[in-house]
């Protein structure tokens, strides 16, 4: 749940912080924002994140504000421990994306494609927050149950008659694409149907063409889900 800026006192009181520390936190935040920003125009987005009994404060200014400030993470000592290289234009949320028992930070974005987001993991070894490189290239990602693989979906033009889904995994805080399903139903395409490809060393190799008529494929999401769930291991093997 997001808290408005005027709710910061209540939020931090739940963490057993007094009013003086609230003022100090506000001052800490002000120091990293460009001069002239009007805090009263829109509320700030603030939430607390707990990882292994340690609490953090995630904060950024409202997406409607003309002067955008990158997302910040502070500890309860008021130290700024992470500044993200970007801004969550559609807000942020916490979720256990990789299902490892730790909450992660999703930064959602407003785009023409839809489903674009960034992801921040907490590294238990270094005790630091780290961004996942390339995550924004995989819109609307879904984890394949019982595996460490994920697949995405995005429109590719022609009123959604063309679309793509990528199979990928995350290693060392980076995303690696290993497969693609490409639906091509647009009349202007030389070939219509569903094309399945392996990605090896960032090069695409078509391995299957399921011929279909031109048009909108109503079963595309079901096809994508079933195919990746039943075939992802074939793409994981080199």
Model region roles, listed by residue range:
Residues 44-49, 88-97, 138-148:
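Beta-propeller blade termini
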Residues 53-58, 98-109, 148-153:
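Acidic/hydrophobic-patterned starts of short beta strands in beta-sheet-rich repeat architectures
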Residues 16-52, 149, 153-238:
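Acidic, small-residue rich beta-repeat scaffolds with periodic aromatic anchors
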Residues 47-48, 63, 80:
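Coil residues (strongly favoring Ser/Thr
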Residues 3-13:
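Sec-dependent N-terminal signal peptides
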Residues 86-91, 134-140, 182-187:
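Short coil/turn segments at the loop-to-beta-strand junctions that recur within blades
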Residues 79-85, 130-133:
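A short beta-strand motif characteristic of beta-propeller blades
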Residues 67-70, 113-121, 160-168:
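Structural motif
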């Amino acid at each position: 749940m997001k808290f408005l800026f005027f709710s910061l006192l209540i939020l931090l009181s739940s963490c057993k912080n007094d009013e003086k520390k609230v003022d100090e936190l506000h001052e800490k935040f002000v120091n990293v924002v460009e001069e002239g920003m009007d805090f009263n125009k829109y509320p700030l987005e603030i939430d607390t994140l707990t990882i292994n009994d340690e609490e953090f404060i995630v904060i950024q200014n409202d997406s409607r504000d003309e002067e955008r400030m990158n997302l910040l993470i502070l500890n309860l000592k008021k130290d700024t421990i992470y500044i993200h290289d970007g801004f969550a234009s559609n807000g942020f949320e916490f979720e256990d994306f990789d299902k490892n028992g730790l909450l992660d930070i999703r930064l959602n974005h407003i785009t023409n494609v839809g489903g674009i987001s960034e992801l921040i993991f907490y590294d238990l070894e270094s005790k630091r927050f780290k961004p996942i490189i390339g995550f924004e290239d995989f819109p609307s990602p879904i984890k394949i149950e019982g595996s460490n693989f994920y697949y995405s979906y995005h429109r590719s033009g022609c009123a959604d008659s063309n679309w793509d889904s990528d199979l990928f995994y995350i290693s060392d805080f980076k995303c690696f694409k290993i497969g693609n399903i490409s639906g091509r139903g647009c009349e202007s395409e030389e070939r219509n149907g569903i094309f399945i490809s392996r990605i090896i060393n960032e090069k695409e190799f078509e391995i299957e063409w399921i011929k279909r008529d031109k048009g909108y494929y109503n079963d595309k999401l079901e096809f994508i889900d079933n195919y990746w769930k039943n075939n992802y291991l074939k793409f994981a093997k080199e």
